[in-house]
Amino acid sequence: MEGAGYRVVFEKGGVYLHTSAKKYQDRDSLIAGVIRVVEKDNDVLLHWAPVEEAGDSTQILFSKKDSSGGDSCASEEEPTFDPGYEPDWAVISTVRPQLCHSEPTRGAEPSCPQGSWAFSVSLGELKSIRRSKPGLSWAYLVLVTQAGGSLPALHFHRGGTRALLRVLSRYLLLASSPQDSRLYLVFPHDSSALSNSFHHLQLFDQDSSNVVSRFLQDPYSTTFSSFSRVTNFFRGALQPQPEGAASDLPPPPDDEPEPGFEVISCVELGPRPTVERGPPVTEEEWARHVGPEGRLQQVPELKNRIFSGGLSPSLRREAWKFLLGYLSWEGTAEEHKAHIRKKTDEYFRMKLQWKSVSPEQERRNSLLHGYRSLIERDVSRTDRTNKFYEGPENPGLGLLNDILLTYCMYHFDLGYVQGMSDLLSPILYVIQNEVDAFWCFCGFMELVQGNFEESQETMKRQLGRLLLLLRVLDPLLCDFLDSQDSGSLCFCFRWLLIWFKREFPFPDVLRLWEVLWTGLPGPNLHLLVACAILDMERDTLMLSGFGSNEILKHINELTMKLSVEDVLTRAEALHRQLTACPELPHNVQEILGLAPPAEPHSPSPTASPLPLSPTRAPPTPPPSTDTAPQPDSSLEILPEEEDEGADS
């Protein structure tokens, strides 16, 4: 956008001011706006102005089921969006910010209703910029001026902090503070002035003019060859930060930051190795590992074979009991029989607990009634095209229902959460025994139960780890996703929640899960499976120039089109490529199980505004006689709702 004497070089919507509703009773607690970088009259200005919310553009909001919160994964506006699939955990709402396009002038009266909040500052007046900690929610930037005052914190609800910092770096030199990696000291892009500033502050041990001239002439090679790592940029050369650089800053707002805003070490990975998968383990091969007393022998070798080739279908019913921890790898045949008898008694005792509840008791137990209603609804829509569950009177549906209700008795704290029926269905299909399937399901839930906890911390942590792996493996793809407001990887949420159950054909899901259950070649292989899928689709995503809506649509249209063997081969190759890197960052080593985890940090006291997990079964009244048509999913599309309070 250009006008008389000014040119807009950067513009980003969805940038909010978070005001105090108690202090400003006549104003919204969230003020939507647009941030711009404007060249005007031989100066460069940073300008923020509020906008008016109007229109009918479509946004995709990932949210907890039956909730109204959070739009931190909102997409860019487009006139229409027809997903052509069933977007689980997606809310479709209609919001379009209407921008106030006016020439930014200092001291001018704003035309927007909330324009008293508008501001414009010359980049030369900036002293420092503080960014928020990495995470899975909104990011903010706090700008401090040379006079010591601070501008209102800018909250980027649709991403864009990195893009803004990249634009600012064209006009300023942003030096990461050695004391605080989230604090950038601002210096002008003038070689002599910058050298004098460095010399005066004694930031460099060596001649500062030489460093500055090399940086300005060739910033790329100077940054990577002289300073080696992005995270350590200027850290080894900078002396302790000048007093007052951080003291002028206000305390950071109580908001979670933008997804993945983390500068990691720049590592050079070696060539990706070639991987060949083996044939499935057969019954004859399995039998060779069974000793005289029925005890399995050479278990590590057997697990490695399962990892590299999977299991033949006829062997799964027996082998899955070991992979899921129902039977011990070290136990004898007699010990296994005794264990099964004990677990059978335990199962039916728990089943009797809910079976013996009378209708009158259930009416006074809203929690149990809520679980039962949710399970009945989900079971009727789980894998209904599979013959084992086909038809309303199919006994397989009854077994699904009974096992899930019994699990509520087994795990009172967790109960039933939508998505669990998707995890149980393949297990029951393979095991074909109610008791054995229940205990195998419990073993699987031990691995993934954190995905369904109401705190959502496990899902946030997994998405953060996935982003970290992807940034090491393919930083260009990460930058592209960031530029399209998809850097939080919300479109991968369903993959991780139910371990790709909806992405592959049913037989391929069985193969994928048994490989993942081996725990080889290390923990979090499912994250590398996600990286492998994105790696396979990177050219399509990047060369097609997809926006956030198209990325979401394309990812969901991959359902049932992926080859599990190709994905597993690529995931293993990615693992070998990472483990062969001698300078792999420690946090990546932790994810791959190559290094012990660091001391756990205290969880953030502020809950994320983005509900990332499906809804727990709520206490519900008895169902009415009128029922709406149900989609073919145990995780349904939320009805269209007003966006009221989504950003609060």
UniProtKB/Swiss-Prot annotation:
The record marks 377 as: Arginine finger. It is found in: Cytoplasmic vesicle, Autophagosome; Cytoplasm; Recycling endosome. Residues 310-520 form the Rab-GAP TBC domain. GO terms for molecular function: GTPase activator activity. GO terms for cellular component: autophagosome; cytosol; recycling endosome. The modification Phosphoserine is found at residues 602, 604, 608. This is TBC1 domain family member 17. It comes from Homo sapiens.
